[in-house]
Structures are given as C-alpha cells and as structure tokens.
Amino acid sequence: MSIRRIEVKNFKSFKELKIDLGKFNVIIGANASGKSNFVHIFEFLRDITSSGLDNAISMQGGREYLRNMNIGASEPLSIKVVSDQEFGLLGRTKVGLIGIKTYEATYEFALRFNKRGSGFRIVKDELSQKCKFLKLERKGRKIKEKEIPGEGEILISRSNGRVKIVLNIPPNVPLKKEVIFPPFLQEEKLPEHKLLLETPYFPPPLESIFSEISIHDFDPKLPKKATPITGKAELEGNGNNLSIILKNITENREKRRKLFNLVKDLLPFVENLDVEKFADKSLLFKLKESYFKTQYLPASLISDGTINMTALIVALYFEKKPFVIIEEPERNIHPSLISKVVEMMKDVSQTQKKQIVVTTHNPEFVKYAGLENILLVSRNEAGFSTISRPADKEEVKTFLKNDIGIEELYIQNLLEV
C-alpha cells in the first residue's frame, strides 16, 4: 500500500482532517460536502512533484482558494502523509555492506501565508524514515542477510533555510550519515519556495508515491472524437486519448487478449475492439458487436457507458501508477453492472498492488462497496468538511442489524446520525 494515513489543516473546505486509508476507499457525501476537495489534496501533492510548489498553488486557484476561506492566513496550511511503502538502501562501511530497510515514512510540510499579498514561507518541511538494518554478506553468487537488532530513524528537515540530516541508529550499527548522503548534500541551502519533496533528498520510491498519483474523471464525449497520434502514452485524466492507449494495447497479443476478456466479461455483446488510423495521422477506436458480425461501430456511435467501462478497465488493469483516483465511475453505467464494477476495483486493489480511491453518489455502488471501505464526507455547522467512517458508528450498526441496507441509510441521509 502507498498511503496509509493523511492529515491536513487549513486546506480548502477542511479545517482539520485525519484519516486512515485502505487499499480500496469509497468516498460518499452530499453535494458540496467536500469530496472534490479531498481529491484536490492528492492533486496538489502530485502537482508539487511535477510542476513545483509555486505552480501547484497557482493550479489550485492561488492561495485564496487553496487555504480555507474562513481561516485564511491566521493558521498555516499543512499536509502530513504517512506511507508504509517499503524500500531499501545500501551503505558501504569498514565492516562490509549494511542494508537499510525503510518500512514507514512520514512527510509533513506547512506553509504560512502573508496576510497581504501572495507571499508565503515554508515553516515546516520534514521527512522521517523508520528503518531496520541488515548486515549483508556475499557467499559466492548469493547475498546472505542478517538482521541487526534495533531500529532507527533517518530524519531530513529544513532548518533556517538549510538541509538538516539526523541519523538516529542503534550503537551496534556502524553507519554514518556520510555513507548515505555525500558531504556536499549535507546542510545545503534550499531555495525559498522549494520543498524537500522536489529535491534529491527525497528517495525515488517515496517521491513516486506522489508523482504517480493518477486522477480520472472520464468524459465519454472526448474519446468519441479522433485523437492525434502524437498524444501521451498514458491515459489522460479525462480519457480523451483512449484511442492511443487502446492502439498500444491491441498491438501486443497478450495485452489484447486480456483487454478483450475483461471487456467481454462486463459487456458480453462486444465481439472485438480495434483502432483505426486515418490519413491525417489521427486515431479512432472502434468495436464490433455480436449483432453486426461484419461491421465495426466507430467510437462516435458507441454508447457513453461502453466508453466509460472501457476507460475504467484501461485505468485499472493497464496503467502502471499505483495510486488511482476515479471520480464517479458509475456514470452512464446500468445499475445491473455496478456490482461487477465494484468487484473489479476490489480485485485490482488486492491483486495489482494498487490503492484505489473512488468518489460516488450512487446507492448501488455504496451497497456493494463494503461498509469497511466507505468514508463519509459531510459539513459541520461551521461549514468545515469532516470525514468519518460509518462502520465505526454504533447507530449504523444497529440499523444494519435490523436489515436496513447501507444504501438505504445513505439515501435517507441516516449515515450522519
């Protein structure tokens, strides 16, 4: 799993949020409750890694719309992420190789905005890595691992505009910070508006947690149009380059077989999928239905639901990013297929090493999601968004014991009791 816990303060409609995430997470709530703002947290983190902090703030509408409007500049905006992503480092010492196995990482930063103007400063920027240590011995072609008793922590932080590195390790581990971080990287001056997340101090396995967040809000009208062949090789958030992705998939025999089997399971009338290339170097995907065995239907004539289902399958099974957010995946899909869509997502979260977050208004989706996977977003009397787990509420458990379905409680707005 990538992200185990997230905490935010003074971010959009949230005053304070602390929430644990599982492998499969279904976000529900009334209109304007804050579901999209929850998604914006991950979007903001991703944009920092790809475009830098200043641009990421601007892409959220600037400081005025990034922070909570009621709180404003009176409190810092902060985000804290806890990850249980495991990864390893090697350190060469006088006694041989020492393996460093990180099993938990916590990254936190806070921004304090000026009361006037658009200025801000970074008041906290800290990465903590909890780790175990291994002594590595080479025996022939094999490397033997022996765990060294005790655990440690690698702490990287911003202090007076410079990088500060602290190594808290057991005395029996012969490791110095110079082995992990070259001297020229220690106490280096950091640019004023640049987070550790944007620097080489952030280990690539951790940085990829944020940079490889994919957010999808599919618009079935866009894939119905011809796509220039020069588009991205990964699925866009709105799905407009679906034809390019399908072309790449169908050119590989094994991937083509897998795609067809997945589509056929949800849409039995589909006989084949293909992509047509035009003289103007554009692509348009097409499919053949069992009702018309000799004729393909172009994307422009394919139903919105069929396109949505195809895009969902591609995002879940063929895209490599480990953290996937899909907004309202049930749109244009018949209620009888919702249970299969939910099971598909659960399967991917368990077997494909992907963490999935879904937002929905659909009672059928809520019905099959599983109570333990549901997160309810609501607004309190002060207008701040809060997130709770209905599974933790005794009143909800009582309703369920009396054979009232979770979807009925959702429709009647009883999950907030």
Describe the role of every protein-language-model region.
Residues 16-22, 315-318:
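Phosphate-binding P-loop
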Residues 237, 241, 261-318, 323-336:
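Conserved ABC ATPase signature
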Residues 23-60, 304, 309-315:
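Phosphate-binding glycine-rich loops of NTP-binding sites
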Residues 1-15:
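N-terminal pre-Walker A segment at the start of P-loop NTPase domains
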Residues 12, 25, 43, 330-331, ...:
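Catalytic acidic motif of RecA-like/P-loop NTPases
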Residues 97-261:
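Electropositive, glycine-dotted interaction segments
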Residues 340-417:
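C-terminal lobe/lid and adjacent interdomain/linker elements of RecA-like ASCE P-loop ATPase modules
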Residues 40-121, 134, 141:
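Conserved P-loop NTP-binding catalytic core
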